[in-house]
Amino acid sequence: MSGSSVSRFSLYSGGMQNLNQDLAQFLEQLKARGVSANTQKAYSSDINDLLVFLSDTKQSLDLEALRSWLYRISEAGGSKATLARKTSAIKNFTAWRADSDLADQDPALRLRSPKLDRPLPKVASELSLSAVFDRMASQATQDNPVGLMNHCAVELLYATGMRVSELAGLDLSDIDHERQLLRVTGKGNKQRMLPYGLRAKDSIERWIRFGRPAVEAPSSPESLLLSSRGRRVGVRQLYDVVASQLETTNLGSAGPHTLRHSAATHLLDHGADLRAVQEILGHASLATTQIYTHVSVERLRSSFEQAHPRA
């Protein structure tokens, strides 16, 4: 950016007002693209944090200021994950400004994101999950709508590997009973079709036949899962249901994402194609799915070391 154009972002010439206006437009653009509310909120928080820093230090939006801001966060104890998230937010914002002709160039183009030490996801054993499903099935009696709903929810999360937010958003019209397919709306409002097996099919049918009518009200939405008050089940409630059920697994404390991790890993353990698993999980990049191959290899190594006489 040239010296004359830098003044556009100088705090002494109304630059902060321009940046705040740009941020408002950027957030509107994210919303229009169907970016999740949580991502919008995180971007808003991180970029506002930068704007406060620029205001406090009377700096312009340039590479040096961005590095100073990230250094300050690091010195204050910010983790690599925090720095990576904030860097991503800023790079998206400044790239959008440049593409929208609100800036002559992108000051974050040379800004590097810290490499994260990515831990392998936690995976519940098939044996411990079988015990969970057996227990839940015994509680899912015709006169127990809560038990039927809980069983249906957990069966579907594991059967399909879907995100808990995707499950919460499912409507009755998203179910193709004949072909045993679910139409799931994922990140960025992208839709995909997910197959489910006979056990999930049974749990869906029992919930719809016996459980859902018991809690349904005239004002109830068309959502597949309803709370005891006849409302769409929220992500928080589903998280609590899964967490309470998984306490008895080999992992102890775990949430819905553990079921997603477990589904992906067990699919690969049983020979599923990596690209098929990518499609099932709704990952934009195959690299995101590849972490499960590492989990599968580690599980293979562990089994070998425990079972082979010459390990």
Where are the language model's segments positioned?
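Conserved catalytic core of the tyrosine transesterase superfamily
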Residues: 2-311
